[in-house]
């Protein structure tokens, strides 16, 4: 007689198999930096299919995601820039770190010119004063796409070397946003009674970070919670984005790089691990924050377009890209230097990546205009600027740079660093 075995563990086996598949899918998304575009795609579909529920959801999560969770992302961005401008970094010498500064100014100037020409052609004089919108660069989006293109997947987060394109474009993006903030400063009214208290808090934050560094505190928690908390509060009181709170704090955290004459010194001093430990521990949490960032901010109704929409898109994706490339070319011709592994083909990809205005362009637009049809046009244009990151990805494939480079060039950065 045949014996039939009845399995009683099949629900558990099925759940384990499903969990493994989900784990593999999540690992693939984090390894290839897909969580941000996934969140943005969900938001875009959701906003156009069920706008009421989406915008209700967005209002609830906007502040904790944009101003708290994103502080972690900007902290990692500051870490990238700080390490590469410190001794031993790809942008350490002034002849190198001034190049992205010049590129930022050139990009903003070209974008402003393109914006003004298009608006003049369309005879929309009311839009002339809104040109600072094209100065905004979404640092988080730029960080995501540049990391996805130039950072080879695999390996532990703390063990990876950054391609110099990453700190280059981040420094460029930060400089462009500083230009934008300076231009809109007269329009950005902050209550006078807030300014004094915020300045004291920021001074206390920087003093705390300096004291921690001076006393060789190697744990990053005091830097984040104490100094970072004071900085966050100062920016919140002042009315700026508190998500930028860690930008002035991370440079005080001990980092891993050393001057060449100290490379073979005693390694028992663990102070240099602080910044690297911070990146290693929070790398995947930052990707989760980017997913929520895309989910909360990328939903837009595909209506309300006009001259402001196309002027913003043309100026940012076209004008700024060309301006950055020209600025880098002029800087190099004047005797400044690109990092060893950065050539003009990489600069072209970086320039396209830097065309994503998104949240900073939205911020500048809402500062310059009251609610109305013109503001709606500009906001839609700002929300469409991430098309630049798609163009950057395609350009990287076409030009064979970053992860699309031939095998012989994939390790070029490591060779230059080791030289």
What are these model-predicted stretches?
Residues 111-116, 183-187, 236-241, 291-303, ...:
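Hydrophobic alpha-helical transmembrane segments in multi-pass integral membrane proteins
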Residues 3-32, 45-55, 204-208, 215, ...:
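Predominantly late transmembrane helices and immediately cytosolic-facing juxtamembrane segments
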Residues 84-116, 193-205, 304-321, 344-351, ...:
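Entry/N-cap segments of selected transmembrane alpha helices
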Residues 80, 110-111, 134-168, 176-182, ...:
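Short helical (or helix-break) motifs at transmembrane helix termini and adjacent helical loops
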Residues 24-30, 55-66, 94-99, 124-133, ...:
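Interfacial loop-to-helix junctions that mark the boundaries of transmembrane helices
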Residues 150-254:
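Functional cores that coordinate and move charged inorganic groups
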